[in-house]
């Protein structure tokens, strides 16, 4: 074992060109051997060289982060309003300026705390994706986190591995390594014994051992970490939707401001300061200041929920794409099956008279590896009475993804040479009869897919049959075939793909959502958007439903934001233009400040009834629903103002005092009406059914009660000359609550009307489709996983449905 001083010497000598000197010189300089390091020596070297990972980006100083959140594009509009208040408003401009600054600070603090929580969630998820590697320590192979590797370690590299360090290859045949992301070279590069492989490159073919020569920041590249960062930073459709919604809100406010300026200043010849106050009402009340942060936090909080159910999101915005998937392509091995092979000895067929079944098994086992075994190797070696029989001196020809074959040359006890091949050719499969049983859960899982809009259908290929199949794919699809299938499906569908191997990498990258199953190769994990930590199909169903719930939560908030903007702009604009009533900017500011508490609750609310069909953030739906809700609420606000300020309807009906001509009390009454209705709207939006059928989240309900208790108390007792308000008493407060309750119910009816107009008969069509799929699926118990020896195809589901039916679903084996 190397001493502390010699380890320091190693660190100095590593600066030499270890990739160029003879391999024996590498072992000398690194003070190591082909038997690997001991555990104790590995720990000592880890102290000297540090962990095998890139340094994390330094966290921005709290002050810089705070100001970055405060000076966002939407905040600029509010800041402009603060400057307008300071320069042009009436004598209360200074107080209004301070109030707007207070709103900005409160919003920024909430955003800061939420984004801090979000960062912790992302860090937790990434910790679950730490790359693994097989390392030789204390003479034994074991799977360890790649971060423990140090120069001098011996590692095993196999197809699908992302090489975790810079290393020199040891004895063996060759590796094919894809280093295009590092060097730009197209296609795999062949590497032989003694050559260097780089951290972050992907092993495509072959299996060799290597000695580590550089780790962490000392490697040629940090591609592994870069892969995750790149995918996390993709925004695409989500960013577009947020930008479009922001633009709609700003344009609506700009239209309202333009109309007010033209009518109030040039037509009505009103005082300039009154015009400014009315403009401030539109700007302060209409800008959805917290929307970008709220949507981001909803997604990150949702990713934590997914993490707890066995799903890690590498790209946050993949949650939106996951909710929209209507075609899910699945690999067979390990997903539909257990990926635990067994050998059925009773089905072994021997074609040579001089060979026994036991000898066939022995030959297959000798063609398998003892250490670092894959599923097939483990099945073959495990079929022997004594696994030690499988070994003598051997020279290996490693598994080849192109030929799908491996071969070993060995010498038996008599000194005779033998060569044994193991692979996928039909004659070898017939000899060994390897069997990969279907998961017991696959029947119910596919049924659940159909019930939730993920339409999974036939996966079969019959040469001689009268059965019409919806989709048919041959056995042993290659990587290129999968890629083209996904590409074709994406012309009409949002396509998800489940994969696990290096051959799935191009398709995983191409798919709208790439999903790596549990125990997938490092290359597949790096190429995917979502990584599963639990086996089987049920976890995917949970992930889809959770994604739809998260997306629905985001949709609820965006509709709410658009509705409030439309309501504020057109409600207060008509009141100001028709009756020349100038609502106090202070009261709009009070509504905005109290809404911050509800905004925080929205991010924590749980959706109990997510969409039963694939869903997405559709701008048409968001805009149409928001405009209808906002216009209706603006209308009932205008009607309330007219009835309370211009008529005696309320005094005659409820025996409350007359507010006609009393501007200060009317200000309080209008404030309470707007405050209640604004927040009550969310109870309608958050439910797919009647609002009273689906109970809102406890935090959201508690927030509503708290905020409206404060608002009601303020309206009843407040007397503030600067804001031009005077308390209206409990009688008027009760009347306003009753008025809002009466006009609240039509919002639910409007919700169903909007949904019907936007979707038409789509919902009924989908219900018919689900029944069709379930009826077809009933045949699964009789026809599932039939292995036809004549043409070597697998039938997972027979469907006698005409191809013209709009059935969506793909799988391959």
Swiss-Prot record:
GO terms for cellular component: plasma membrane. Mg(2+) binds at residues 500, 504. The modification Phosphoserine is found at residue 776. Keywords: ATP-binding, Magnesium, Membrane, Metal-binding, Nucleotide-binding, Phosphoprotein, Transmembrane, Transmembrane helix. It is found in: Membrane. Residues 87-94, 267-275, 578-582, 644-664, 719-726 are extracellular. PROSITE patterns: ATPASE_E1_E2. One of its GO terms (molecular function) is ATP binding. Residues 1-66, 116-245, 294-555, 606-622, 686-697, 748-813 are cytoplasmic. It comes from the Eukaryota. It is a multi-pass membrane protein. The chain crosses the membrane at residues 67-86, 95-115, 246-266, 276-293, 556-577, 583-605, 623-643, 665-685, 698-718, 727-747. Belongs to the cation transport ATPase (P-type) (TC 3.A.3) family. Type IIIA subfamily. This is Putative ATPase, plasma membrane-like. The lineage of its organism: Eukaryota, Viridiplantae, Streptophyta, Embryophyta, Tracheophyta.
């Amino acid at each position: 074992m190397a001493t502390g001083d010699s380890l320091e010497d190693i660190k100095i000598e590593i600066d030499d060109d270890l990739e160029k000197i003879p391999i024996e010189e590498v072992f000398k300089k690194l003070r190591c051997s082909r038997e690997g390091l001991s555990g104790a020596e590995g720990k000592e070297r880890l102290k000297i060289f540090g962990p095998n990972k890139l340094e994390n980006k330094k966290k921005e100083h709290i002050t810089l982060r705070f100001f970055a959140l405060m000076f966002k594009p939407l905040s600029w509009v509010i800041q402009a309003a603060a400057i307008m208040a300071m320069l042009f408003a009436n004598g209360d401009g200074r107080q209004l300026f301070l109030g707007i600054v207070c709103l900005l600070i409160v919003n920024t603090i909430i955003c800061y705390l939420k984004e801090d929580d979000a960062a912790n969630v992302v860090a937790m998820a990434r910790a679950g994706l730490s790359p693994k590697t097989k390392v030789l320590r204390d003479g034994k192979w074991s799977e360890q986190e790649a971060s423990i590797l140090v120069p001098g370690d011996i590692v095993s590299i196999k197809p699908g591995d992302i090489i975790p360090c810079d290393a020199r290859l040891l004895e063996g045949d060759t590796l094919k390594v894809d280093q295009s992301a590092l060097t730009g070279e197209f296609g795999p590069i062949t590497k032989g014994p003694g050559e260097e492989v780089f951290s972050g490159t992907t092993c495509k073919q072959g299996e060799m051992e290597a000695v580590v020569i550089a780790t962490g920041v000392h490697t040629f590249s940090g591609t592994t970490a870069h892969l995750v960062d790149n995918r996390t930073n993709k925004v695409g459709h989500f960013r577009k939707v947020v930008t479009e919604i922001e633009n709609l809100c700003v344009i609506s406010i700009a239209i309202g401001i333009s109309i007010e300026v033209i009518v109030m200043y040039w037509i009505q010849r009103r005082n300039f300061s009154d015009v400014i106050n009315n403009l401030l009402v539109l700007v302060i009340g209409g800008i959805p200041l917290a929307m970008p942060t709220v949507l981001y936090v909803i997604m990150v909080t949702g990713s934590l929920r997914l993490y707890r159910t066995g799903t890690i999101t590498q790209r946050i915005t993949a949650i939106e794409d996951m909710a929209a998937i209507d075609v899910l392509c699945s690999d067979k091995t390990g997903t539909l099956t257990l990926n635990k092979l067994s050998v059925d000895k009773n089905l072994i067929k021997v074609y040579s008279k001089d060979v026994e079944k036991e000898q066939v098994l022995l030959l297959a086992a000798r063609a398998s590896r003892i250490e670092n075994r894959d599923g097939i190797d483990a099945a073959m070696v495990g079929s022997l009475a004594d696994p030690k029989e499988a070994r003598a001196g051997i020279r290996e020809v490693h598994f080849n993804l192109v030929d799908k074959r491996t071969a070993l040359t060995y010498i038996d006890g008599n000194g005779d040479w033998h060569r044994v091949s193991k692979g996928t050719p039909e004659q070898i499969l017939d000899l060994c009869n390897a069997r990969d049983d279907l998961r017991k859960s696959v029947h119910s899982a596919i049924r659940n897919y159909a019930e939730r809009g993920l339409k999974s259908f036939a996966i079969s290929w019959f040469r001689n049959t009268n059965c019409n199949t919806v989709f048919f794919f041959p056995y042993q699809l290659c990587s290129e075939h999968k890629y083209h299938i996904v590409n074709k499906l994406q012309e009409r569908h949002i396509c998800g793909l489940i994969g696990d191997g290096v051959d799935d990498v191009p398709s995983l990258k191409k798919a709208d959502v790439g999903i790596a199953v549990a125990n997938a190769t490092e290359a597949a994990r790096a190429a995917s958007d979502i990584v599963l930590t639990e086996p089987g199909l049920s976890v995917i169903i949970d992930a889809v439903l959770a994604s739809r719930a998260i997306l629905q939560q985001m949709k609820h908030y965006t509709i709410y934001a658009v509705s409030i903007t439309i309501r504020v702009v057109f409600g207060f604009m008509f009141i100001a233009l028709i009756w020349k009533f100038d609502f106090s900017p202070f009261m709009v500011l009070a509504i905005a400040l109290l809404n911050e508490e509800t905004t925080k609750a929205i991010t924590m609310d749980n959706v109990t009834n997510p969409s039963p069909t694939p869903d997405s953030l559709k701008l048409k739906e968001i805009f149409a629903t928001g405009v209808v809700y906002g216009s209706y609420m603006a209308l009932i606000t205008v009607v309330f103002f007219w009835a309370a300020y211009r008529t005696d309807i309320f005094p005659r009906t409820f025996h409350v005092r007359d507010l006609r001509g009393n501007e200060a009390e009317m200000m309080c009454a209008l404030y309470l009406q707007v405050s209640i209705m604004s927040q009550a709207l969310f109870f309608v939006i958050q439910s797919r059914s009647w609002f009273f059928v689906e109970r809102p989240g406890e935090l959201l309900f508690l927030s509503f009660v708290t905020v409206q208790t404060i608002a009601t108390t303020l309206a009843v007792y407040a007397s503030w000359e600067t804001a031009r308000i005077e308390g209206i008493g409990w009688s008027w407060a009760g009347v306003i609550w009753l008025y809002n309750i009466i006009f609240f119910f039509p919002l639910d009816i409007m919700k169903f009307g909007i949904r019907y107009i936007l979707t038409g008969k789509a919902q009924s069509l989908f219900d018919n489709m689900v029944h069709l799929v379930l009826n077809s699926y009933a045949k699964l118990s009789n026809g599932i996983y039939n292995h036809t020896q004549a043409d070597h195809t697998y039938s997972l589901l027979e469907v006698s449905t005409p191809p013209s039916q709009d059935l969506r679903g793909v799988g391959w084996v």
